[in-house]
Amino acid sequence: MADPRFFRRAGPFSLAQLASLSGAEIAPGADPALLLHDVAPLESAGPEQLSFLDNRKYADAFARTGAGACIVHPDLAGRAPAGTALLLSRKPYRAYALCAQAFYPAPAAEGGVSPGAHLHPTARVGEGTEVAPGAVIEAGAEIGNGCRIGPNAVIGRNVRIGDGTTVGACASLSHCEIGSRVVIYPGVRIGQDGFGFAMDVAGHVRVPQLGRVLVEDDVEIGANVTIDRGAGPDTVIGRGCMIDNLVQIGHNVHLGPGCVVVAQAGISGSTKLDHHVILAAQAGITGHLKIGAGARIAAQSGVMRDVAPGEQVGGSPAVPMRQWLRQVAVLGRLVRGRGDEDNGRNG
């Protein structure tokens, strides 16, 4: 159960309501009027709680669950225990996410500028926007309606922020335009200089970074992410991208819609990711590359060439996934063989 000190719960919701908002179907025999009061894991859910099964690995836990209702793929519905109502979905995790959002909606902005905030006379703050103590809103900045600006956040000169966007504590935004319903977590840095220098033994000369960062609607940017502004072209984060904590995005990078970038990954300057690319944790992409739509980059990979649409790569330097797995297997056999030889000599 979520700690009520931190999470405010809505509801209850009927099975019919949850089916409607999640796109799931009520299984035959289930009562559409059944009221659910909360969500919970399979192992701990009770008769007034909703759970879900997405991974077949947990089918045994599903068979033993005490949940009042469960979201499940139709193929696994036969494993359900007696007394558990079912919502059938071919995407159970997505359906669960929509239901969980209903039970635990994001808190709305309370509205109002704290007396402890610093708001420039030429800055504009929309209706219902909350500006916390210590926040700094610089000259010419425009913040939309229903936004939340956290403590000690800095919104730089002429920055624009769309409606319903949240900027976390101690984040700093400059040289950027932020869309609507964007979530920016604490410590994020957007719009600082890109890493651009004319290298020379006589001394490195900084190249002025004259672009911006454009963040489109419905993006999430995790804690302590850094996104450099463009050198001339803009750095662009496409609609619906999800960026995990501690990610570095270099100048002129372009992320297409729906990309997912996982923690500690890095993307060097001028690289372009098409839509719905997945970049796993600690992977790195060198500059000036093109990563095709739907490509998947394995964790800790080092990408040094273009990646075709839909291709899966891994390793450093990154190669097609099957080739990488063969390399790992061969290396393992070589190491084990060498170990056997060493043991023979020592014996």
From Swiss-Prot:
User: Which Enzyme Commission number(s) are on file for it?
Assistant: 2.3.1.191
What keywords are assigned to this protein? Acyltransferase, Lipid A biosynthesis, Lipid biosynthesis, Lipid metabolism, Repeat, Transferase
Q: One Pfam family from the UniProt entry?
A: Hexapep
For this record, an example GO cellular component is: membrane
In this protein, the active site sits at: H251
Q: Does the keyword Nucleus apply?
A: no
The domain of life is Bacteria
What is its biological role? Catalyzes the N-acylation of UDP-3-O-acylglucosamine using 3-hydroxyacyl-ACP as the acyl donor. Is involved in the biosynthesis of lipid A, a phosphorylated glycolipid that anchors the lipopolysaccharide to the outer membrane of the cell.
Q: What is this protein called?
A: UDP-3-O-acylglucosamine N-acyltransferase
Source organism per UniProt: Rhodospirillum centenum (strain ATCC 51521 / SW)
| Annotated gene | lpxD
